[in-house]
């Protein structure tokens, strides 16, 4: 108890210090990405730190833990989304005009570089790196700090895309205020990322049409054996002040379902290794019943790819039908009690659709493996 009390006092001191740094304009905690240097806000609020840099932080408590005792991956995703929502909403309201709130449209691939422990302080730093006419790109770094030793480490990197929705009509997308780039190449690189994610979002929306159906008495190691679903009634605590679900709430539920699928498949401790792009196809309003479904799509020797689909049912509005709200692929690894990675049982696809999804997952796995190896090669 004494250590916890001391940790809480230190955490409060750290929050106060972070606030002073933010006001003083000393920028973000953690390393920046070299290809995406911070840009400058244009408008009445240009006195903020570069790009309106947003820093949030809090101590990780026992209710943030997964069954293994580390911080739940969904909790980290939720903190990432909150930081992104703050900075993008702030920027989109930086000029005079119709007020808006930034809604999450997409999360690019997110890597879990290192586990975060209960009792550590999570520092989440966000900055805007590109804007188009109707969207904002935000890059987020997550650092963990051991407040007893002072040691810090980078645990997560993520890129998120937001769109500004009018407060008067949340179905209306507003224009994004411009930013000033430090160099022309930075804007060109951002435009390429924007066009790439836009194309992939369109392809994903058409591809993810089928619904996960339960199967009686499935065989072990098959897709049906581990597929899982959660049903959740969207309440006020899940929503923004404007009545639709926080993207972070949806991501945490998706991570929980993916974790259940992975645990059922390998019967060991599991941990989130990465999240492929999460696409938010439509808003989820308060009062909807959402079904979050997960199924195994591919296994390598030591990793599992799980597809997660979110369907929303507006039960209080008979004029609306059930619709696909979000979709993503999660990658999990199996761990021993000592925290070492273990081989996973190989998935046995049965139907033609399952075999097709397996080959598609294999392609994504090999593509990402080649990309990692390319980054690991020494520079000449």
Swiss-Prot record:
Entries under PROSITE patterns matching the protein: HOTDOG_ACOT (PS51770)
Residue numbers spanned by region Disordered: 350-380
Domain-related comment: Both HotDog ACOT-type hydrolase domains are required for efficient activity.
Matches recorded under Gene3D superfamilies: Hotdog Thioesterase (3.10.129.10)
SUPFAM superfamilies tied to this protein: Thioesterase/thiol ester dehydrase-isomerase
Keywords of the record: Acetylation, Cytoplasm, Fatty acid metabolism, Hydrolase, Lipid metabolism, Mitochondrion, Repeat, Serine esterase
Lineage: Eukaryota, Metazoa, Chordata, Craniata, Vertebrata
Name of this protein: Cytosolic acyl coenzyme A thioester hydrolase
Membrane spanning residue stretches: none
Modified residues (N6-acetyllysine): 168, 198, 283
Biased composition (Basic and acidic residues): 353-363
Task performed by this protein: Catalyzes the hydrolysis of acyl-CoAs into free fatty acids and coenzyme A (CoASH), regulating their respective intracellular levels. Preferentially hydrolyzes palmitoyl-CoA, but has a broad specificity acting on other fatty acyl-CoAs with chain-lengths of C8-C18. May play an important physiological function in brain.
One function term, GO molecular function aspect: carboxylic ester hydrolase activity
Tissues with expression: Isoform 4 is expressed exclusively in brain.
Catalytic activity: hexadecanoyl-CoA + H2O = hexadecanoate + CoA + H(+); octanoyl-CoA + H2O = octanoate + CoA + H(+); dodecanoyl-CoA + H2O = dodecanoate + CoA + H(+); (9Z)-octadecenoyl-CoA + H2O = (9Z)-octadecenoate + CoA + H(+)
InterPro entries: Cytosol_ACT (IPR040170), HOTDOG_ACOT (IPR033120), HotDog_dom_sf (IPR029069), Thioestr_dom (IPR006683)
BP GO annotations: acyl-CoA metabolic process; coenzyme A biosynthetic process; fatty acid catabolic process; long-chain fatty-acyl-CoA catabolic process; medium-chain fatty acid biosynthetic process; medium-chain fatty-acyl-CoA catabolic process; palmitic acid biosynthetic process
GO cellular component term, pick one: extracellular exosome
Subunit structure and binding partners: Homohexamer.
Enzyme Commission designation: 3.1.2.2
Active-site residue list: 66, 255
Domain HotDog ACOT-type: 50-168, 224-338
Native species: Homo sapiens (Human)
Pathway the protein acts in: Lipid metabolism; fatty acid metabolism
Domain of life: Eukaryota
């Amino acid at each position: 108890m004494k250590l916890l009390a001391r940790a809480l006092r230190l955490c409060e001191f750290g929050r106060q210090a972070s606030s002073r740094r933010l006001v003083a304009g000393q920028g973000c905690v953690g390393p920046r990405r070299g290809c995406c240097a911070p840009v400058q806000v244009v408008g009445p609020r240009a006195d903020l730190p570069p790009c309106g840099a947003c820093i949030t932080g809090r101590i990780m408590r026992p209710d943030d833990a997964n069954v293994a005792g580390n911080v739940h991956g969904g909790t980290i995703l939720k903190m990432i989304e909150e930081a992104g929502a703050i900075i993008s909403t702030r920027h989109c309201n930086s000029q005079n005009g119709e007020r808006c709130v930034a809604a999450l449209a997409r999360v690019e691939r997110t890597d879990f570089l290192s586990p975060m422990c209960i009792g550590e302080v999570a520092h989440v730093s966000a900055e805007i790196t590109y804007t188009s006419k109707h969207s904002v790109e935000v890059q987020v770094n997550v650092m963990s700090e051991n407040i007893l030793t002072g040691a810090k480490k980078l645990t997560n990197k993520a890129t998120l895309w937001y769109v500004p929705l009018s407060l008067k009509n949340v179905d209306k997308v507003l224009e994004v205020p411009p930013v000033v780039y430090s160099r022309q190449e930075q804007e060109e690189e951002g435009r390429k990322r924007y066009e790439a994610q836009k194309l992939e979002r369109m392809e994903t929306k058409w591809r993810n049409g089928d619904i996960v159906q339960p199967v009686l008495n499935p065989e072990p190691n098959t897709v049906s054996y581990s597929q899982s679903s959660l049903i959740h009634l969207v309440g006020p605590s899940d929503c923004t002040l404007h009545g639709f679900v926080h993207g972070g709430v949806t991501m945490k539920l998706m991570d929980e379902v993916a974790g259940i699928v992975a645990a059922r498949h390998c019967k060991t401790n599991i941990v989130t290794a990465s999240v492929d792009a999460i696409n938010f196809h439509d808003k989820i309003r308060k009062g909807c019943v959402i079904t979050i479904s997960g199924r195994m799509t591919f296994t390598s020797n030591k990793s599992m790819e799980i597809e997660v689909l979110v369907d929303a049912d507006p039960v209080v509005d008979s004029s609306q039908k059930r619709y696909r709200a979000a979709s993503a692929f999660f990658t999990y690894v199996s761990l021993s009690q000592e925290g070492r990675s273990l081989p996973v049982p190989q998935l046995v696809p049965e139907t033609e659709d399952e075999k097709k999804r397996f080959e598609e997952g294999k392609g994504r796995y090999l593509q990402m493996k080649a990309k990692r190896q390319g980054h690991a090669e020494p520079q000449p």
